Amino acid sequence: MKITRIEPILIRTPLVLDAAVPHASGAPKNDVHTVLVKVETDEGVTGWGEAFSNAGWQSTCTAIAQIIAPRVIGKDPSQISQIQADLHRGLYNTGRSGPTVYAISGLDIALWDIAAKRAGLPLYKLLGGSARATLPAYASLLRYGDKKMVVDKIAEALGRGYRLIKLHENKSDIVRAASIACGPQVPLMVDCSCPWTVDEAIAISREWVDMKLAWIEEPVYPPDDHSGLARLRAASPAPIAAGENISNFLEFKRLLEAGAVSFAQPSVTKIGGVTEMRKIFALGEAFGVTVVPHSPYFGPGLLASIHVCAAAAREVWIERYYCDFAETPFGEQIIPRNGDFAIPQEPGLGKDPDTAIIARMRV
């Protein structure tokens, strides 16, 4: 089998919005952009991956089409480890983070999709299997910056069966209102989005001590200040989580060696795909750190995260951005039911996208 074509596909999925309009980077967030990676082979097996996009989707699409594809077309898609190694070594001078690594991540997910399809297995079984049929999802609320909106969204999420809540807020009055809304039985996590110095974060963590947060996520800027995070972790009453902005194994190793976090959060669309994500799980086990992936995605990135987590020895929480769509190319597979994700049972990632919907959403 040979790879014959690699295509980046950008889609825009509109959000279903109510009175509570979320914000991102200071502007209303009305939709989600996703960079899909479609890998075709000469035997008719097609794999689907996802590369981190956010505001830099143009650069990521260019990296896929002009940097990655020419180096990989014609290769055997089953040689995943060798393809990964060749790309990382051959492209080191483009940087160890950013669009090139995001492109490699999307390719890697697609190659694992192909491998599992050829084996006739859902990916998690190819990775070691699981005794579980579901994994708990946590409702990862978007940023609202408004106390009432946040409290209303928490009530809605709990009503849908979620048992774990995460905020993207950093104002104490909002966090405290959310803690009251959750009550003592619902774990509450807070993603702060890197707003503070280490000393400021220590002060805030102590101010929040009575809320008994499950974790405080990315409280410090810059996010790669590992020694600063370690100092915060030693002083904070709440556990510290970080890692979504790390894009290579070595940097994750440095994070854990520094003793910076209790929860490590690799992102499969940034770290190098399934191949590198599995290494981070092993690294976490070696350091006694819990790995809980960053997965605010709605396609192959989310599905790949579910499969890797399903194959882990212990139960892993799955992040699900708490928002709704009128339609999505990946249908019901990306929607939790009663607060749980069903582990996909079809070969590969378990769900190929609806190409008609892709055609309507394509940018």
For the regions a language model picked out, list residue spans one by one:
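Short glycine/serine/threonine/alanine-rich loop segments
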Residues: 74, 121, 238, 289, ...
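Non-catalytic terminal accessory/regulatory regions of metabolic enzymes
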Residues: 1-46, 65, 81, 155, ...
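Flexible C-terminal active-site loop/helix
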Residues: 2-4, 8-17, 29-34, 275, ...
